[in-house]
C-alpha cells in the first residue's frame, strides 16, 4: 500500500475512473517490475496481493496518513481497462430489464445528453472526493448514478454492494449532481465484482460537468 505523491494524484485525475471512487491501475516500480492494483480516490494505491479488508482496519484518513509514500517506489502509473464480466447476475439482468435493456458497463455505451433538470448522485467513501472540484464541477471520466437508482441505497454498505465498489468501507458520502442540459453522459449497468452483486445503474460523465453543478456531500448511515 502506498500513499501517492501529488504528481501521481494529478496524473490519475486526468484519467477516467473505473467506477465511483477508484481506478484499476498498473504500476511500474523503480526496479521496472509491474504490479496491478487499485487506486482509491486517486491518492492511495493498494496492490492486488494486499487484502482489501485493510480498508476496514481504521478510518480512511488514518490509513492514508500511515501508508508508505510512493516517492522512490514508483516510476509510473496508468489506468488499465477492467476485465470484462462474462455472465450477468440475476440482479444485473433485473436492473437491465428495468433500464432500457442495457446490460453492459457505461464506458461501452453510446453517448447521450442530459435533459433539463436531471439529477444524479455519487456515493463515495471519501468526504474529500478528489473528482469533485473546488468550483463545484465533476472531473471528466467520473462516475455517478441516477437519482432514481440512488433511491435503492439507504446506507453506505448498500452503495458498496449495488455499485460493486472495491473499497469495502461504507460509501456513505452522497454528492448531488445537477448538470446543465445537454451534458454528455453514458448509461450502463454495474457488473458484479469484488465479491459484490452490482446491478445498479452507472452513469459516466465522459466530459465532466460544469462549475456549481455538484453539491454535498450529505452523510447517510454506514450500515
Protein language model annotation of sequence segments:
Residues 81-223:
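Catalytic toxin/effector domains delivered as secreted proteins or via bacterial secretion systems
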Amino acid at each position: 500500500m502506498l500513499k501517492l505523491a501529488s504528481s501521481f494524484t494529478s496524473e490519475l485525475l486526468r484519467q477516467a475512473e473505473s467506477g465511483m471512487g477508484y481506478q484499476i491501475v498498473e504500476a511500474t516500480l523503480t526496479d521496472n517490475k509491474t504490479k496491478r492494483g487499485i487506486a482509491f480516490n486517486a491518492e492511495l494505491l493498494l496492490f492486488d496481493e494486499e487484502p482489501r479488508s485493510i480498508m476496514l482496519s481504521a478510518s480512511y484518513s488514518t490509513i492514508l496518513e500511515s501508508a508508505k509514500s510512493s516517492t522512490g517506489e514508483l516510476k509510473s502509473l496508468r489506468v488499465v481497462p477492467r476485465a470484462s464480466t462474462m455472465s450477468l447476475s440475476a440482479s444485473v439482468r433485473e436492473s437491465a430489464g428495468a433500464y432500457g435493456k442495457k446490460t453492459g458497463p457505461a464506458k461501452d455505451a453510446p453517448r447521450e445528453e442530459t435533459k433539463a433538470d436531471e439529477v444524479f448522485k455519487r456515493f463515495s467513501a471519501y468526504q474529500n472526493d478528489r473528482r469533485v472540484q473546488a468550483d463545484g464541477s465533476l472531473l471528466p471520466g467520473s462516475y455517478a448514478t441516477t437519482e432514481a437508482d440512488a433511491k435503492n441505497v439507504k446506507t453506505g454498505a448498500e452503495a458498496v454492494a449495488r455499485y460493486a465498489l472495491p473499497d469495502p468501507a461504507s460509501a456513505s458520502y452522497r454528492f448531488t449532481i445537477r448538470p446543465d442540459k445537454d451534458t454528455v453522459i453514458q448509461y450502463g449497468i454495474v457488473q458484479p465484482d469484488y465479491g459484490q452483486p452490482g446491478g445498479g445503474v452507472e452513469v459516466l460523465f465522459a466530459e465532466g460537468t460544469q462549475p456549481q453543478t455538484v453539491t454535498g456531500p450529505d452523510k447517510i448511515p454506514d450500515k
